[in-house]
């Protein structure tokens, strides 16, 4: 299964906003919409971690998807109400406009036993 990991810096003061939103997607009132969105986008696994650093907090994201590039592109253009909310959330807490594209990270290692 194709996968990708990436980080997105959290804007100052936005860590708790992001934490609450991600919990609402995972186990809260947005779970059904989140699951429908990810199914429609072909994302089969999504994990999000918050990493504190001296320079500020980061969201560390891991995706598995049938087609990672298509999932990013479809998320950026989807008219689904949840996907629109999610893009607004990303803009609010990370300062990233998903619609502008997101360059993939360079993978430099992939160990598997």
Model-derived regions: residue spans:
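Short, well-ordered beta-strand segments in beta-rich or mixed alpha/beta enzyme
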Residues: 5-9, 45-77
């Amino acid at each position: 299964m194709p996968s990708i990991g990436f980080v997105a810096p959290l804007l100052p003061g936005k860590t708790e906003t992001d934490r609450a939103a991600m919990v609402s997607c995972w186990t809260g009132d947005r779970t059904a919409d989140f699951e429908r969105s990810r199914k429609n986008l072909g994302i089969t696994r999504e994990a999000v971690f918050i990493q504190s650093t001296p320079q500020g907090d980061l969201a560390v994201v891991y995706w598995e998807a049938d087609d990672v590039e298509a999932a990013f592109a479809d998320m950026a253009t989807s008219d689904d109400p949840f996907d629109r909310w999610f893009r607004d959330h990303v803009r609010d807490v990370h300062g990233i406009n998903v619609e502008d594209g997101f360059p993939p990270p360079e993978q430099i290692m992939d160990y598997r036993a």
